[in-house]
Amino acid sequence: MKSLNVLLIFSILSLVGCSSPSPNIQPRAKFGLLFPDSIGIATMESAYRTAPRYVPGASQIGMFPQIALRRLEFFDEQTCSVTEPMRAYGSMQARDLNALTDFCLRQQVASKVEPTKGQAMQQSIDVFFATDRKELRDGAILGFGNERGSFSVGLVQVSIPREHKLGAVERWSSSTLWPRRSEDGFEILSIRLQGQQSFFQQTKEQLQNSKERRAFIFVHGYNVSFADAALRTAQLALDLDPEALPVFFSWPSQGAMQAYPVDSQNAEWTEANLQKFLETFGSTSGAESIVVIAHSMGSRPAMRALAKVLDKRRDLRSKFKELVLAAPDIDADVFVRDLVPAYVALRMPVTLYASAKDKALQLSKQFNGSPRAGDANPRPPVIAGIETVDATDIDTDFLGHAYVAETRALLTDVTLLIKNRLRATDRPGLLKVDAGAGLSFWRFKK
């Protein structure tokens, strides 16, 4: 069977070369003189990659570019705007709000990795997980396989690459001549199983430092291993909302392109476990603002499980703020007839991202004999009570199925949705489209 899901591996961006101005000029002045005529995102990219050169001692400790840019005080993270010093030196004149917000996302990563005085540079992130996959052991826990297993929770420590491109899950390449280093890419450093009491005690402790106590729960799709899900969640944590608690639920996908029928059965089987986890997380984790992000086939159990939780536990409705459906591989008729009405009745916000270029969902349509909710051909599903975003015009991989996690415009839009709580009508990158009968959907501006 042809692949229904391909996750491309992106290479790490190379550093931009430039000559250093006179050493008697102050760091910010030095930095500004390098880019006197540039405008927009190209300047921001150059500034991002070269900033460590102009912070004393940065190269000796391997300072992250995000941190160096903060030290130079060229960017205001709170307002996502350029500071006056940077404007004064002509380094950047960003006029595009989406590009500016995108760059702001990079800077917020620094809050995760900048050490306090006397600490070593943090180069990893802890990602919380729940899974019903079978454990892989050799005495100690090695990971989780593709078979059904008992329910487990714990933490995965994932390395953070020094140079991270928005939307990419960079991985170390075996073809390189350089020795392997964890900071070269996303990599699982350790897996720690925990009891539920210890697990939720740790979520509470981490959320205590968060003003809004935000968390997101990622439910992956078809053809995804446990390791793939962990690395993708770490990438989403960096790119979407570094201040939110990153959590993923991993069901027993076979991690194989030809195993679509088995994955489909397991996605149905996992629903009860996911429902139990969502309910327990909502009531026990300490999070006050929870977003569920479901991709592809993972949207099936996620939609049903969350609706049951919210119907059963009225006290949790205020905590679950949004359900984001990214390219959902759900029968479109079932979606409209059975699933959406439940969320409309619950007054639960739902955002659907769909694309007419999603070849994976087109293949799924052929396999299942029915159109899919994430397929925007000839147009996306437009239903009263949910917000639909047509991402057809966004450049994606050749299957166009992982676009929400991998493309700049999509990541920016999702961030404005889940972190800034902006509805589609208020997000600057979207254009409202009249669908008739008093209904509307949104497209990305060209």
State the predicted function of each range.
Residues M1-L7:
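Bacterial N-terminal signal peptides that target proteins for export
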Residues L7-L15:
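Bacterial N-terminal signal peptides
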Residues C18-F35:
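Bacterial Sec signal peptide processing site at the extreme N-terminus
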Residues G32-F103:
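Post-signal/leader-peptide non-cytosolic segments of secretory proteins
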Residues D102-S210, A230-L240, A244-S289, L306-E322, ...:
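Lipolytic serine-hydrolase domain surface
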Residues I217-G221, A327:
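The conserved beta1-alpha1 loop
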Residues S225-A229:
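Short substrate-entry loop that stabilizes the transition state in hydrolases
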Residues A294, G298, A302:
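Gly/Ala-rich beta-loop-alpha elbow adjacent to hydrolase catalytic centers
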